Regions:
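N-terminal secretory signal peptides and thylakoid transit peptides that target proteins
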Residues: 21-40
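Short active-site neighborhood of thiol/selenol oxidoreductases, capturing the structured segment around
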Residues: 76-91, 113-116
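Thiol-/selenol-based redox modules, centered on thioredoxin-like
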Residues: 162, 167-215
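N-terminal amphipathic/basic-hydrophobic helices that include classical n-h-c signal peptides
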Residues: 1-26
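Structural microenvironment flanking redox-active thiols in thiol-disulfide oxidoreductases
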Residues: 92-158
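N-terminal "domain-start" segment that seeds a small globular fold
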Residues: 51-74, 159
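N-proximal helix/coil linker or "cap" segments that precede and/or mark the start of modular domains
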Residues: 35-37, 42-60
Length: 215
């Protein structure tokens, strides 16, 4: 019997146990890596599913245009939408002019500007739908789609704005003032949000619109 064989025989049970432990450790590491990868994939899939669900919800929410006709964002499927909460007696009311210019510039490429009057901020939209429509036409020659008055915050928040600003939204958080803006791509996904101070001709806003349009 050689010295090496003697050592091997002496180590027998301990060596086998050590080898078994190493094998188990390797298997445990592989199992952990596999479980981690699976969990990451599940989280990613969940995020994608949530995003798709929010987009689908936006498309289906019942709305009324400013004339009282039933509609949904789904009626504008395949378009790029700029959703704006508007008011007639606000310091930002002048943005109607820029929004109309933006609409006329890009409407043939698929942009739809959407005005949603609300009276939530300083009671700056006291008019009814007829008065709002007349004001927008006479003062700014607005031709982009306008909708019935709705709430954008608090207990009276419309389901559209609940979806746009809720915890599962792409850009959660309450609208702070009139002329807040949400940009929705052709698939129905909200891709950008802008506050009241962002003018319709803002370079960043225009560039994002052009990218969404594929210009």
């Amino acid at each position: 019997v050689t010295f090496r064989e003697s050592v091997s025989r002496f180590k027998g049970p301990f060596f086998a146990a050590e080898q078994t432990d190493r094998t188990h450790n390797i298997m445990d590491r592989r199992s952990f890596i596999g479980q981690t990868a699976a969990a990451s994939a599940a989280v990613l899939a969940g995020a994608i599913t949530t995003s798709s669900a929010v987009a689908a919800d936006l498309q289906a929410i019942p709305l009324k245009d400013i004339g009282g006709k039933d509609t949904t964002l789904g009626d504008y499927k395949g378009k790029v939408l700029l959703i704006v909460n508007v008011a007639s007696r606000c310091g930002y009311t002048r943005q109607y002019s820029g929004l109309e210019a933006l609409y006329r510039k890009f409407k043939d490429k698929g942009l739809v500007v959407m005005g949603f009057p609300c009276n939530d901020f300083g009671a700056q939209e006291p008019e009814d739908e007829f008065g709002i429509q007349k004001f927008c036409k006479d003062k700014f020659d607005v031709t982009f789609p306008m909708f019935s008055k709705l709430g954008v915050k608090g207990a009276a928040k419309h389901p559209l704005y609940a979806a746009l600003t809720g915890p599962e939204a792409a850009f959660p958080g309450e609208v702070k003032w009139n002329f807040g803006k949400f940009l929705v791509d052709r698939s129905g996904k909200v891709i950008a949000r802008y506050d009241s101070k962002t003018e319709p001709d803002d370079a960043g806003l225009v560039a994002t619109i052009e990218k969404a349009l594929g210009s």
